From Swiss-Prot:
Domain KH: 214-274
Name of this protein: Ribonuclease Y
SMART domains in UniProt: HDc (SM00471), KH (SM00322)
Family matches, as HAMAP family: RNase_Y
Source organism of this protein record: Chlorobium luteolum (strain DSM 273 / BCRC 81028 / 2530)
BP GO annotations: mRNA catabolic process
Subcellular location, principal: membrane
One Pfam family linked to the record: HD
Family affiliation: Belongs to the RNase Y family.
Length: 524
């Protein structure tokens, strides 16, 4: 019995200890799991906080960069606004000054017109007086005939003829003097009117003159792009030059790449190609060839737009597409360092204004002025550009007045209309005025004047020669004993002809012969 009780106690104790161990183990396991969960949650919170901190720092960095970029753009914009405002104020001031000048010139022209009308009235009165005097002369002749018949044995016909001859001689002398005086007054008034017309035309237009060079500048976003433009071992530069025929210069100048070529059209094509490559961001030989082809299509649009813009600015309608394309091509050519299209527009505006002042058709004048140098962009022609342009435009049924003005503006054809004279004068003004011919240096001008004097010195009987008015007049002093008045006229013609054949000059040169003969005697 005692054994059974002990066995029971042992079993009971085992069960109790087992249960206690089970519950204690479960308690410790649950406690350990709760601790790990708390640690994981704390770690997660820490990670989130660190990520939030990094995000805030990154956000602050980007906000700072954006603010700096905005401030930079704002400064650039403010500077540009200031520059444009200054330029606008200058242009406004120039316009006001020119308006005042034009008002004064308009008043001068009106005064001149009134003077011409007064002179016309005086001339009409003079003609009326001449008619009255002629009637009086006939009456006097009749009376003299009657007197001669009564006091002389001469026949009436003989006496009448004698009187008529005397009176005709005297009348011719008086008429010659009157005509000479009227002619001088007309020349003087015409000179004043021509001067005012030219001044009005020149002052009513304004073109910025800039000498054309052989460089184009392309701005890039950063200097890092220069390495991509060069390519590995310079292969991209070689491919670009082979495709475009334009030299590309990559130097230390920040954010700038330079294109160099003597042909402005080719250089502009290359500039568009490079801009397309920079916009796409892909630069390699195949991409360069594709960009060059795409830029070629865009160049055709650029050329047509330039031609249409020139026609619109001059209000010239009805121009065939082929001619519009050639006009646009002139934008990418130069003459004496001056942009060819700008020069042609200037000639057109000058000719149009002068035609308006002289009551001629300004549309024909502007049309001829714009097209006068189109022969310089015609391909494969051996003719002088003026004649080549005239023949080319004849195919498009251009008016005869315009064709003659174009063909004659360099003296290779006879001028058949006043429009031709105006286009020639406008061309000379545009090329000869200061700032237009940037290629003509001071040293070149000195040599030109010296050559003109040497040409005149080579003729017999010449003592001295002087080039005056910047070469627009050559004054020649000759020996009075060896050169007569008639010989002086021939000498002036010969010198002018030799200058035309041997010298190059803008406009016309006046040759003046000065002949002086001195006779000396002494009273004793």
């Amino acid at each position: 019995m005692g054994i059974v009780i002990n066995l029971f106690l042992i079993i009971f104790a085992s069960v109790v200890f087992f249960a206690a161990g089970f519950f204690l183990g479960r308690f410790f396991l649950e406690r350990l799991g709760t601790t790990k969960v708390l640690e994981a949650e704390e770690r997660a919170v820490q990670i989130v906080q660190e990520a939030q901190k990094e995000a805030n720092e990154y956000k602050e960095l980007k906000v700072t960069e954006v603010n700096q970029e905005w401030k930079k753009k704002r400064r650039e914009f403010d500077q540009e606004v200031v520059i444009k405002n200054n330029k606008f104020n200058q242009l406004q001031k120039q316009v006001q000054q020119r308006e005042a000048q034009l008002k004064k010139q308009l008043q001068d022209v009106r005064d001149t017109e009134r003077k011409l009308q007064d002179q016309q009235k005086e001339l009409d009165q003079a003609m009326e007086t001449v008619g009255i005097r002629a009637t009086e002369l006939e009456r006097i002749i009749t009376e003299q005939n009657q007197r001669l018949e009564s006091i002389s044995n001469l026949q009436a016909d003989e006496a009448r003829q004698m009187l008529v001859d005397n009176m005709i001689t005297k009348a011719r002398e008086e008429a010659t003097e009157t005509i000479h005086k009227i002619h001088e007054e007309a020349e003087e008034n015409a000179g004043r009117l021509a001067e005012k017309t030219l001044l009005t035309a020149i002052q009513r237009i304004s073109f910025e003159q800039a000498t054309e060079n052989a460089l184009s500048v392309v701005h890039i976003q950063s200097d890092e792009l220069k390495g991509r433009i060069i390519g590995r071992e310079g292969r991209n530069i070689k491919a670009f030059e082979n495709a475009t025929g334009v030299d590309i210069i990559v130097d230390d100048t920040p954010e700038v790449v330079i294109l160099s070529c003597f042909d402005p059209l080719r250089r502009e094509h290359a500039k568009l190609t490079l801009k397309k490559l920079l916009a796409d961001g892909v630069i390699h030989p195949v991409a360069i060839e594709k960009a060059y082809l795409d830029a070629g299509k865009e160049m055709a649009d650029v050329i047509m737009s330039a031609g249409e813009e020139a026609l619109a600015s001059l209000q010239i309608p009805d121009m065939p597409a082929e001619i519009v394309r050639l006009i646009g091509t002139m934008k990418f050519h130069s003459v004496y360092g001056q942009n060819l299209l700008q020069h042609s527009r200037e000639v057109a505006m000058l000719a149009g204004i002068m035609a308006t002042e002289l009551k001629l058709d300004p549309r024909l004048a502007k049309r001829a002025g714009l097209l006068h140098d189109i022969g310089l962009v015609l391909p494969d022609t051996d003719q002088p550009h003026a004649l080549a342009a005239s023949e080319f435009l004849r195919k498009f049924k251009e008016s005869a007045v315009v064709l003659n003005a174009i063909a004659a503006h360099h003296g290779e054809a006879e001028k058949e209309s006043p429009i031709a004279e105006l286009v020639d004068a406008a061309n000379v003004i545009s090329l000869a005025r200061p700032g237009a011919r940037g290629a003509v240096t001071a040293d070149g001008n000195v040599k030109r004047l010296e050559s003109l004097e040497e040409i005149a010195k080579g003729f017999p009987g010449v003592l001295k020669t002087y080039a005056l008015q910047a070469g627009r007049e050559i004054r020649v002093i000759v020996e009075g004993d060896n050169v007569s008045d008639s010989q002086a006229d021939v000498l002036a013609h010969d010198i002018a002809h030799k200058i035309e054949s041997e010298a190059q000059y803008p406009g016309q040169i006046k040759v003046s012969i000065v002949r002086e003969r001195r006779s000396v005697a002494y009273a004793k």
